[in-house]
Each structure stands twice: as structure tokens, then as C-alpha cells.
């Protein structure tokens, strides 16, 4: 019986990972599963650099154009649907999972901490105590006493994490460190052979690629795409807060000029790419290849990985 093989194609925005995934899926008779948290949504095409309909027709694509507005997708739901979709894909077809949303990749590979319900009255009491500086200091001290290992990582100003830790301590009788250790002890390994690859670029070259992409997005009708979303009453839809959309929304509301729009999208995309690069560089299992000249080498690595 064929053993399913999964290939993560990861990297920062504008690195060409989607192009690599498409070429590889065509050559090795595979499928593509989207792992970009914006490309999941219908109606978000230009600003998310979603593959064109012609490209999507070349190989089967999953979790792309998947969620209808105004619905929203959580990482937990993505992880659930990812594994459900794998059941639909023949085991002999390699699965190329492509995107830049590192948290989603981590969720499907390593699982997610369970969402532990906390009684409303405890939530309300903790929220009340956090309203004052003195209350936050007391709760921080309570956290440090019950969970010094976790508490040492949390700054006094991070009231959200302080509050969540106290909610768990009071409702579960366990520290965050204990809960995390229990989860880790039950964590199951990824169930399929896994290869992780990604294109890498010199930072200045990537900066140029990002600038070119932003120009193309605006020329392709990004402003009209966002205006259409506004016309449908989707101004408060959470995905519109993503890079490219939030700046265009500000432009349409008269907050910035057209030249400022291009500049802001470009700057914020650079910052996004930096965050993505930092996230993925922590994963030492990812094999990086030159974005301009490394595809032949990537192809060889994938071919070897897929050999029975």
C-alpha cells in the first residue's frame, strides 16, 4: 500500500514558493494544499497573491478559496480540515503544502494546545482585578508563586497572558507549565513522511521582488477588489486587516494618498517577510535553496524523498 508523502514548501512572501510547489506538483503528479491564512478566503484574490484560475486548473488545489465571507477560520479549524481533506486525496499522490503562515504549519505538524474552558465567573473576576495597576501586580505575583517557570517569561505589562495563566491556575488547579507538559507527553509524531523545503533570497533582492509585486497588485485592481468588499459590507471582516488590504482600506477612506498607499503596502510587506523569515529560521529541519537557481536541486531532493 502506498505511503502518503507530504512536502512543506515554506518561506516569506514573494519568494516564489507557490511557483515551486506548482512545478513540483505537476512533475510528480501531486496536489497542492494551501497554507496561507489569507488565500483561504474567497474574494481575497489580488491582495493575497492567490494563484490564478489557470494555475489552479493545472493541479488539484485544496483549502484555497475555501471560506466564504463573512466567516473566519481559526488555526484549530484549519488543522481539523487539513486532516479531513487528506482522507480525500489518494495516498499515492504527494501532497505539497505551500504558504507562509508558520503557525498553521506548526499546528498540522505538531498539534495545538487544547482550548481549556474557564468558568465565566472566574474570567470576570480576573478581568476585574486586571483593571488596575495594583491588581495586575498582585496577579503577576500570584502567577510567579504558582508557576515560576512560566511567570519568568511573562512581562508585567502582558496582562493578557497574566490573566490567562491565573484563569487556568484558579479553574484547573494546574499551572501553565503543567498543562503544557501534559500536552507534550501526549503529542503524537506527524503521521507521514515529511520533507520541508523553501526558496531563499538575498534580502535586497527580496525587497525588489516585493516592490514589483505591490506594483502588479495595484495595476491588477487591488483598490477595486477592496472597494467591492466595502460595497458588500465587509469593512470589519477580520481578514481585511491583513497586509495589502488594511492599507487600501485606509486609502479608500481618504486617510492616505495613492503614492502613500504603495509605499505603506511595500513597507508593511517587508516587515511581514521579516517576521516570516524569523519564524521559519527557527525550524532547523527546513532545507533552504537559492530562489533564483536552486530549483533543479530541489527537484532532485524531492525525487529522492518520493522514491519507494
Swiss-Prot record:
One biological process term in Gene Ontology: tRNA modification
Coiled coil: none
Cofactor(s) the protein requires to work: Mg(2+)
One Pfam family in the UniProt entry: IPPT
Assigned EC number: 2.5.1.75
Site (described: Interaction with substrate tRNA): 101
Record's catalysed reaction(s): adenosine(37) in tRNA + dimethylallyl diphosphate = N(6)-dimethylallyladenosine(37) in tRNA + diphosphate
Binding site for substrate: 13-18
Keyword terms of this UniProt record: ATP-binding, Magnesium, Nucleotide-binding, Transferase, tRNA processing
InterPro entries: Dimethylallyltransferase, IPT, P-loop_NTPase
SUPFAM superfamilies according to UniProt: P-loop containing nucleoside triphosphate hydrolases (SSF52540)
Function recorded in the entry: Catalyzes the transfer of a dimethylallyl group onto the adenine at position 37 in tRNAs that read codons beginning with uridine, leading to the formation of N6-(dimethylallyl)adenosine (i(6)A).
Subunit structure as annotated in this protein's UniProt entry: Monomer.
Family in the record: Belongs to the IPP transferase family.
Protein name: tRNA dimethylallyltransferase
Organism: Bdellovibrio bacteriovorus (strain ATCC 15356 / DSM 50701 / NCIMB 9529 / HD100)
Source lineage: Bacteria, Pseudomonadati, Bdellovibrionota, Bdellovibrionia, Bdellovibrionales
